[in-house]
């Protein structure tokens, strides 16, 4: 109450920020007349002037009025569009490390040119981030003439580019790119084996379009570069046959309740849980099929991988639906984004789920992969010095943007008042009655020439409604993941009089629906259109446009509420753009997923009793309150999940940052000899400590074991026992000095043979290869730790603290292993002179001749062994004459026949 009174008097923080920015807008507007008098050349020269002023120490913020005035004037001349005052405000918000909420149709693409131009003046590069390559290309090509007029270069970074094209894209002043390609390039850069193979030089300023989709909806999706792992496709097929014999029960067993099923489902988290009866049934089945021995537990350490496959199969069958969560296309499982309804080609679920779904659908099971490098969008975009974003729906997630990314959300007012009629939700007893009412509403709109956009939450629902409309004889278009290729054309026609379009949640987002249809799309279809043709198309469009406006504009129908209010607002936001008329209404039923999952059985039963007549709809404030509570529950649950993920990933992120920083230092340095020397000293001290404890008595020393270790791991054959006997002054410090001196001397001898440059390159190669291999293994170990860490809670321990503690220990162990492996490899490598190489080649040829003779003898005599031996027989345990340093039986002797 008090807050409301104070806000009325002083205004909200959003209002105060807008008032402050309006002062800047007035300054920019005053410059307009002056800039209109500039010639094209004078306007272009402003870019050089601004860059010079920045180099001379002027702050970027001081350039805002003139830079924005420059872009506005250039936009008028090149694009034929003048940015509105609210777009100038949006541009300033985006420059201030904030999120600008701008309604659909308010010109976000043009608004973005203002902060992009300003920040590109620094020469550090600007990345404009979009959700797909179509939007990246479209926005880049739309704004390219403007930026190039002002002397800025524009690049496009999308999947499928050659290294040269990608390098050119990143070298541009302003780069349009997809979020996934930026993230994968970052990971690929940190797997590169030379500095020249890296693409991303500097992460300076990122402007994220549809920021809620990327930083909220995609936050829990890690970007992963993976390599092949062990094939277990047969196991997935076997476990797939187990699922049909299992019985589901409604809720988990408790002291008060004991069900008779084998498993329960957690629909909120998409997880399955086995009951004790289920475990016993599965163990019996596994024994019968020979997967486990009698009396062996499913939870024994040796069989834990079986449990992994069982849970994957259970989730695949019971929690993931075809044409809802995925589609089958060309014999492959393609994931459908639950938020956008778009297919995500190339994406795969982890934890064996994708393989389990492949087994379920009877398509080829592709091998599991081992993670080589990974990062979440949350942590990738926090790497930028300056981050901003824009979307039509951010205010509902403002708290999360502030908490996770430190980004404040500013709601930008519309250029014209929004007059859309958002009608009260209407509830039905079941889905059939709801669909009947939707079809009646659509019939009414079609009769009045009003276009309709119907939003569904899945492909399955869109096809159900499509069938119902077809039966009713209503012409319509369907836009979902199955008809993705026709997206642009369907959206272009969605504003025609009486047009009916069914779309999954946000499929087609990023493209406005123009009342009367998109006349520009019609013109684009023509080859070399004449002025007369263009004018005729415009005139026809104007008639259609007025017809649709008179009918009430675009009518939005939501077939059910989404888990998130933001997704509902995105659907509504399709209508009422730039002051156009429009309307919206959501049709709900008690069968809807949101109701079933998030409302108690008691509430559902109470609501069922409120329906007294068949097929009647119900509108009430209480209903709106119930839905709002359900959505608030889901949003809080999802926020907690993303926050929890970030807290765990931050641990890995600190380690990732340390490793990648070290790796980039290695790539940038031509000479790492000093680093190797420091590591060598550390490794030898550590090894000697194992056998000669610091400050210990001579009797505690294990010299024979140390001699063996030095010979095996470092190829150093040192008479330590003899040194100890002959030298009375021989102590721990002398031992360390002598061992290290011999190691360095031996290493320098090798260096003299091959030359400094070759040795430096070899050192760098060994260091990088070892680091990459150990980091890959570490990621796998961290993943296993993460999966099981929640069990520590049963021991009254904080899983997060335990994860931090154990992962840190694993990280330090990995670094110790890295040092040891690098020095071991460098110490054991054998350097051969040209003379030795020639001798080895002669020995190899002799072996080849003997092998050929053996083959010839076998062919001629039909016997399995050759009795005559030529000259000297090489012993199986002797060194191979090829010079590899391996025993003959493990090298060329493995091929020779005796």
Swiss-Prot record:
Compositional bias of kind Polar residues: 855-865
Q: Which GO terms describe its biological process?
A: intracellular protein transmembrane transport; protein import; protein targeting; protein transport by the Sec complex
List the CDD domains hit by this protein, alphabetically.
DEXDc_SecA, SF2_C_secA
Q: How does it assemble?
A: Monomer and homodimer. Part of the essential Sec protein translocation apparatus which comprises SecA, SecYEG and auxiliary proteins SecDF-YajC and YidC.
| Name of the protein in question | Protein translocase subunit SecA
A GO cellular component term found in this entry reads:
cytosol
The encoding gene: secA
Topology versus the membrane, per the UniProt entry?
Peripheral membrane protein
Q: Which SUPFAM superfamilies match?
A: Helical scaffold and wing domains of SecA (SSF81886), P-loop containing nucleoside triphosphate hydrolases (SSF52540), Pre-protein crosslinking domain of SecA (SSF81767)
Q: Which Gene3D superfamilies match?
A: Helical scaffold and wing domains of SecA, P-loop containing nucleotide triphosphate hydrolases, SecA, preprotein cross-linking domain
